[in-house]
Amino acid sequence: MGYNKLTSLSANIKAIETAVAIHSQGRTATQEEKQVLAQYSGFGGIKDVLDLGTDKPLDKGVAGLLNRLLDALRTLAGGDEAACRSLVESIKSSVLTAFYTPQFLIDAVAAQIHKTFSANGLQMQSFLEPSAGIGGFLPVAMPGTRSYAFEKDTITGLVLSLLHEDATTVTAGFETIGT
């Protein structure tokens, strides 16, 4: 099955709406909510979001979805227009910088890491995912490992923190580590 931007956009918006609800209620995500959050794939390649917050007419095929997205961002921003604009800009900048890592690649890397650690009698004590997205590589960490995740995009960072509450999540670029 090929990539369908409308399906991806719809899943992203549903995940964001779910994340906003969880965040506003100040609680952790249920397993069912985590399944919804896990469908979030970011906005890499979904250029339609570049029209968010502009006077440009929205494409009829995505107008309803983009309006839902804007509503969710306004809710997350708590009515603060500057905060909402910042969230919109964060999403727009991710169009060119967000990348999806397929599960088969994550599985291959995980298998090699575990094989190398086992073969050499090593024990993982901490695990860093420097450009986390929604934390696809975090499950690579072995039991008892402290996990740290950096994610630059604000919305993706929120989804990440709700999916992996056991990891220390930093919503900032990896280049800020130690500052």
PLM regions with names:
Residues 1-179:
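Class I S-adenosyl-L-methionine-dependent methyltransferase catalytic core
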